Amino acid sequence: HGDRLFHDTRWDFKKGGIHFMLTRRQNLLETIRGGHPDRYVNQYEALGMLFGNPYTAASPNAEYGKPPVKNAWGVTMVWPEGTPGGFPIHDEEHIVCKDITHWRDYVKAPRLDYSDAEWEPFIAEAEKVDRNEYFVTQFIAPGLFEQCHHLQEIQNALINFYEEPECTHELIEYLTEWELQYAEKICKYIKPDAIFHHDDWGSQTSTFISPDMFEEFFLPSYKKIYGYYKEHGVDVVIHHADSYAATLVPFMIEMGIDIWQGCMTSNNIADLIAKYGEKITFMGGIDSASVDRPDWTPELVEKEVRRACEEYGTKYYIPCITQGLGISTFPGVYETASEAIDKVSKEMFK
């Protein structure tokens, strides 16, 4: 794999004399294992992100500022200008699952029976990634909780955890079985080293459902899904939830998450690192809302980056804006954050 110490190393003359720099991949592994990283992992730099495969090619995604599209699950998505991501349209006409007690009549999982030939161009994309330098990383979204509310609408979904728990369990089981089939195809054809799996579990200040309810409805499914990936060649499971989810960290560890990306400052990250760092790494700490805004300045971004790095330290922490991809809503913010992280990194890793 890519963690052989002197394979594909680069010279670094910055500190006087010659020494070997870790590859981006090695540096991430050193960070999450509590080893000896020689710099910060800079946001998404270690991830060779792959989005395409035959399923995603057949399921349109909302594009920034473009008209709504209907995806393979029948959910109508739109991404309005000035907003951080796509979201379903949930008027009566567009809600897919109008009655959870009859969910089987409404929810039809997309096909996954694509031929080897249909996978070929996507295998070729994966083969372009230098696995010594990067993790071949499969992007997967939405997650189970998000899919539940994409299909039903958020209030309906939350009410149904209470009013129709049996039907909600059935729907989650159905979604889980489909995800496991999807995982099988991804591992067979793409052979990823990492997965980047989205599922937002809270608002800025609270989880959407209680920890007990989360444990009951979602922990078993995610143990199966992330367990499957780990058993089939995936080294690093990265889960995106740009929300409050501190109360769910023990379940994240149990389900096999290595890195929680999107960890907002409302989670008291320093406390989480002290308590759980040896078992999970926290990637975030720079709230998108605080820097990715119309009136942003390089000074503002650097100030926030510096605060995060000084507050959270160098072990089990990856500085990153909480946005769920290496992009920003306002052009230049992501790149400016990367430059600031590089600058602060040189000061903190002497």
What name fits each language-model region?
Residues 46-48, 59, 95-97, 155, ...:
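Short, charged/polar low-complexity linear motifs in solvent-exposed/disordered segments
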Residues 54-57, 81-85, 89-92, 149-150, ...:
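Short aromatic-enriched loop/helix-cap "lid" or pocket-rim segments at secondary-structure transitions
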Residues 33-35, 40-80:
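N-terminal accessory/capping or targeting/presequence segment of soluble
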Residues 4, 8, 13-16, 20-45, ...:
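Active-site loop segments of alpha/beta catalytic cores
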Residues 67-118, 129-137:
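A contiguous, low-structure linker/loop signature
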Residues 49, 84-86, 144-145:
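Short, acidic Gly/Pro/Ser/Thr-rich loop/turn segments
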